[in-house]
Amino acid sequence: VRCVSQMVNSQANNIKSGWKNIFSVFHLAASDQEEAIVELAFQTTGKIITELYVKQFPSMIDSFQDAVKCLSEFACNARFPDTSMEAIRLVRSCAHSVNGAPQLFADHAGMENDGAVAEEDRVWVRGWFPLLFSLSCVVNRCKLDVRTRALTVLFEIIKTYGDSFHPNWWRDLFKVLFRIFDNMKLPEKHTEKAEW
């Protein structure tokens, strides 16, 4: 984690295709129980999201889903509640990145399945859906305070940006939302869900 953090801090402008691997390392570190590991990985991930996305988002777009998944894992680490809340805040800032560059997602067909996805739906498939789905996963997996924050941010994103969603995107979104509430109907297996 320290080596990857050092590489990001010193050579971020030279990293082109390695962002997926960087987020994979930080995703693994996000679930660790050692505070120093989680903190270093999260600080570097936060720097990528807040500083580097502003400067070089187009060259990092292929790793966007990995970044969101990584933030979701930080949010679900129950041992570090402050990091969890900050990770959810960063997911919300990722929504701003998606909203600011919808054409970038449409134009950049770098993934193998993008040929089957209509150009106008690529921002949904590669941007909005992974972001909203990751928040729903946090709602389903985490402690009450983190779940509540994730649900609040999920609905804030929908209220803020939902007017730009196409009708077929809403169908996908409702499936995600209904899944959250369907999970709450299941018999209790985890004490955290009993808090609802």
Q: What is each PLM-predicted segment?
A:
Residues 20, 65, 129-130:
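Amphipathic alpha-helical repeat elements characteristic of tetratricopeptide repeat
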Residues 45-49, 100, 104, 140, ...:
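Extended alpha-helical scaffold regions
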Residues 23-25, 42-47, 64-68, 109-112, ...:
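Short alpha-helical linear motifs
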Residues 1, 9-17, 25-40, 55-59, ...:
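Short coil/turn segments at helix-helix junctions and helix-capping linkers
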Residues 95-102, 149-165:
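A short, hydrophobic/aromatic-rich structural module that often spans a beta strand
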Residues 2-6, 24, 43-50, 69, ...:
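Residue-level signature of alpha-solenoid helical repeat scaffolds
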Residues 1, 75-119, 174:
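Eukaryotic alpha-helical scaffold "rod" segments
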